[in-house]
C-alpha cells in the first residue's frame, strides 16, 4: 500500500486550511451600498414628501431617528421639517407635487452613501398656479438594521418661477 510521505500530508492539510480560510473570509466580506439602493431611497424619500403622502408619516420609514435637514436657512429635525413642508403646501394651496432629479453624483462605501443632485420640483395649486423650484441638494445615507436610511439632507433653493393661472 502506497502511503504519502508525512510532508505531503501536512502540505495538503495546509492547502485545505488556506482554501477554507479564503472561502470564509470572502463570505464575510460586506458589500458596498449600490447606486441603485441610493436612487431607490431618494425616490422613496420624495414619494413620502408628496402632498398626498405627507400626513401619513411615511417619511419615517426612510430616515434615521436622528435625521435632520438644513432647509430655508434653518437646521430642522424631523418634527420641524414635517411642519415646515406641511405649512408650505398649505400656503401654496398645493394640489400636486412632483420632483425630477438631474446631475446626480453618488459616492458609496460599505456603511454609507453620499448623493448630490439638482432637484426640479413642480407644485400645482388648486387655483392652477404652477410653482417651479430648483434646489441644489445633498444627502447622507447610512445602513441600518432596517436598510439604507437618510441621515442628513442639505437643500438650497437656487431658482423659483411662478406661473399664474391662465383663467
Question: Which residues does each predicted region cover?
Answer:
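Sec-dependent N-terminal signal peptides
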Residues: 17-26
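Short, low-complexity N-terminal intrinsically disordered segments enriched in polar/charged residues
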Residues: 28-56, 60-61, 166-167
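Short, cysteine-centered beta-strand-loop-beta hairpins and adjacent loop/turn segments enriched
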Residues: 91-95, 122-131
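Hydrophobic/aromatic beta-strand elements that line small-molecule binding cavities or substrate pockets
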Residues: 85, 101-106, 119-121, 136-142
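Short, Lys/Arg-enriched N-terminal segments with co-localized hydrophobic residues
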Residues: 2-13
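A short hydrophobic beta-strand element
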Residues: 111-121
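A solvent-exposed, acidic/Ser-Thr-rich amphipathic alpha-helical stretch
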Residues: 55-56, 60-108
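Short beta-strand edge/turn micro-motifs at domain boundaries
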Residues: 134-165
Amino acid at each position: 500500500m502506497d502511503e504519502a510521505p508525512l510532508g505531503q500530508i501536512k502540505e495538503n492539510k495546509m492547502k485545505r486550511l488556506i482554501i477554507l480560510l479564503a472561502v470564509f473570509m470572502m463570505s464575510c466580506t460586506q458589500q458596498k451600498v449600490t447606486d441603485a439602493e441610493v436612487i431607490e431611497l431618494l425616490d422613496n424619500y420624495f414619494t413620502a414628501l408628496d402632498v398626498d403622502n405627507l400626513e401619513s408619516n411615511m417619511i419615517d420609514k426612510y430616515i434615521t431617528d436622528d435625521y435632520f435637514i438644513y432647509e430655508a436657512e434653518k437646521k430642522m429635525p424631523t418634527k420641524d421639517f414635517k411642519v415646515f413642508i406641511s405649512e408650505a403646501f398649505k400656503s401654496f394651496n398645493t394640489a400636486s407635487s412632483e420632483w425630477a432629479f438631474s446631475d446626480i453624483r453618488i459616492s458609496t462605501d460599505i456603511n454609507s452613501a453620499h448623493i448630490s443632485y439638482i432637484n426640479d420640483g413642480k407644485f400645482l395649486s388648486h387655483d392652477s398656479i404652477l410653482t417651479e423650484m430648483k434646489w441644489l441638494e445633498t444627502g447622507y445615507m447610512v445602513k441600518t438594521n432596517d436598510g439604507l436610511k437618510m441621515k442628513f439632507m442639505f437643500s438650497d433653493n437656487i431658482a423659483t418661477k411662478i406661473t399664474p393661472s391662465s383663467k
